[in-house]
């Protein structure tokens, strides 16, 4: 029996990788426009990082993490999200001693044991941005504007931005009391997980995916009615900044996000009732992980989910030709010359492909056409004797005669 990729994973084949490269290049350029620099963190971390950062009572920690003991008996977890590792690296690298804010972006695989379905894999990839050291709501608005710009540049329409504030630990305590009072009336109907959350972290019940719990929380108290004046001012400022940036939004008081580290601002980008990007502020996570008290805000965007959206919206990603020139040959002597010419061109960053299979000239030209080469030429005995060769533009068949030895002249055709 042939081996297959594990359930919930997907190979990225060369026929699809150009789409990822296109998006990654676009994301890098946009991140650079905002002054962000790249960070790369390990694919696995100590489990405690996610227990402390993401939260013991979250679905991610309780149900979805890939956790194991290494040979030394240490508990290790494959990265289920990108923010906690970025914060850990920020603290461990003592970047808090540098001039703030610190702006980072990353591409990372994340692993969660979830039910596999359309657009949801057990290993998927995220593009994320994290900004440390700035507490003003203008930073929240700036972070939110990045996905807005991405969707606009890609031509994705129909994306809705939902925002909320879940307050700070001080005002959340008051809200939790009101929420527990409301939930106590239907305590017996809560799922077993939410019964555990009732005392430990009732806010998590608002994020439960079980139908009975979703029905119960429909009429729950709204957290915006309980946030303190400071959090209220921050949220009002955020809305003002979004208005100035002409970013349309809707306030959804039931967004809480599935991770415990969030405070104040939380947001989601929705299309066709599916979340395609989400984030928020996490002003207490850096201190929780061992750093100083320092504000932070960021987001994560699933790349597979974005690609699926582009496909559903019939938005095509342009495929660049990966071969500039196909160099055909007839005979061993010509093959030697082709090898030498290909090396000279590759040294000048011209993408070349040559025949290694001993194909006929007709088969070589078919291959050149199939791989999408921009140009082709064939060297044989006559071309070697005259030093001249016909360079064919594959798009329309137009040919020009070039001198084999005039590399600079040949280069100009491709530049």
From Swiss-Prot:
- One Pfam family hit: tRNA-synt_His
The record ties this protein, via InterPro entries, to:
aa-tRNA-synth_II, aa-tRNA-synth_II/BPL/LPL, Anticodon-bd, Anticodon-bd_dom_sf, His-tRNA-ligase, HisRS-like_core, HisRS/HisZ, HisRS_anticodon
> Listed GO cellular component terms?
cytoplasm
Molecular function, one GO term = catalytic activity, acting on a protein
Q: Which UniProt keywords apply?
A: Aminoacyl-tRNA synthetase, ATP-binding, Cytoplasm, Ligase, Nucleotide-binding, Protein biosynthesis
A biological process term (GO) from this entry: histidyl-tRNA aminoacylation
Q: Which domain of life does this protein belong to?
A: Bacteria
Query: Which PANTHER family is this protein grouped with?
Result: HISTIDINE--TRNA LIGASE, MITOCHONDRIAL-RELATED, HISTIDYL-TRNA SYNTHETASE
User: What's the protein name?
Assistant: Histidine--tRNA ligase
Recorded source organism is Clostridium botulinum (strain Okra / Type B1)
């Amino acid at each position: 029996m042939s081996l297959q990729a594990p359930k919930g994973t997907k190979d990225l084949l060369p026929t699809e990788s150009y789409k990822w490269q296109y998006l990654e290049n676009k994301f890098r350029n946009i991140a650079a426009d905002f002054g962000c620099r790249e960070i790369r963190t390990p694919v696995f971390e100590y489990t405690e990082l996610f227990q402390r950062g993401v939260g013991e009572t979250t679905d991610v920690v309780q149900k979805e993490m890939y956790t194991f003991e290494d040979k030394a008996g240490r508990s290790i977890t494959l990265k289920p999200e990108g923010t906690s590792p970025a914060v850990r690296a920020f603290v461990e690298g003592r970047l808090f001693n540098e001039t703030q804010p610190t702006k980072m972006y990353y591409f990372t695989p994340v692993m969660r044991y979830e039910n596999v379905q359309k657009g949801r894999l057990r290993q998927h990839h995220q593009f994320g941005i994290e900004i440390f050291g700035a507490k003003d709501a203008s930073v929240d608005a700036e972070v939110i504007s990045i996905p807005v710009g991405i969707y606009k540049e890609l031509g994705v329409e129909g994306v809705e931005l939902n925002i909320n504030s879940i307050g700070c630990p001080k005002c959340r305590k008051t809200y939790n009391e009101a929420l527990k009072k409301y939930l106590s009336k239907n305590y017996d109907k809560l799922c077993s997980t939410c019964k555990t959350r009732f005392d430990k972290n009732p806010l998590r019940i608002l994020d439960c995916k079980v139908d009975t719990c979703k029905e119960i929380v429909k009429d729950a108290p709204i957290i915006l009615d309980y946030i303190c004046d400071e959090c209220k001012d921050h949220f009002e400022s955020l809305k003002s900044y979004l208005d100035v940036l002409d970013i349309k939004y809707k306030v959804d008081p039931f967004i809480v996000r599935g991770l415990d580290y969030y405070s104040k601002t939380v947001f989601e980008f929705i299309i066709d009732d599916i979340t395609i990007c989400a984030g928020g502020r996490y002003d207490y996570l850096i201190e929780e992980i061992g750093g100083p008290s320092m504000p932070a805000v960021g987001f994560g965007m699933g790349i597979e989910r974005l690609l699926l959206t582009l496909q559903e919206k019939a938005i095509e990603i342009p495929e660049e030709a990966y071969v500039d020139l196909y160099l055909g040959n007839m005979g061993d002597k010509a093959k030697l010359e082709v090898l030498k010419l290909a090396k000279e061109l590759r040294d000048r960053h011209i993408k070349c492909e040559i025949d290694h299979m001993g194909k006929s000239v007709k088969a070589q030209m078919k291959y050149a056409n199939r791989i999408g080469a921009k140009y082709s030429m064939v060297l044989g005995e006559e071309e070697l004797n005259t030093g001249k060769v016909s360079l064919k533009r594959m798009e329309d068949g137009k040919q020009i005669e070039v001198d084999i030895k005039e590399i600079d002249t040949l280069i100009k055709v491709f530049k």
